[in-house]
Amino acid sequence: MNSFTLDEIYVGQKASVTKTITRGDLYAFAGLVDDYSPVHIDKAFGEQSPFGRCIAHGFLSGALFSTLAGNYLPGAGSLYVRQSLNFLRPVYAGDTITATFEVVKKGEEVTKPDGTVKFSPGRIVMKA
């Protein structure tokens, strides 16, 4: 776990975290947020959906930004106060995704990171 002070953070600084999404993650996240939509957890329903199989909840991928802020950049003691996401592609069980923050602006009290989630390696799944 990192713990950067505002003085230590610089524009262009990056942090990334990689996770392989499992079927277990889909069920665990559904239980955590009480969202049992069949497109996320029902195999037969997922196969009949436009996606062809179950997809991860968008915020399961988006939660990696909280992981980045709390553990890597800036790390311990940071407050994650705002998030705006664009979901560009579905994420399936078995996909490995990488979330990345890059500091694009630094103020006197806060920094503004840009974030992306990509398939590892590959196309962008989500932008923040």
Language-model region placement:
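HotDog/MaoC-like acyl-thioester-processing domains
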Residues: 1-11, 91-128
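Glycine-centered flexibility motif
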Residues: 31-34, 67-70, 107, 115, ...
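Catalytic strand-loop segment that frames the active site of acyl-thioester-processing enzymes
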Residues: 1-54
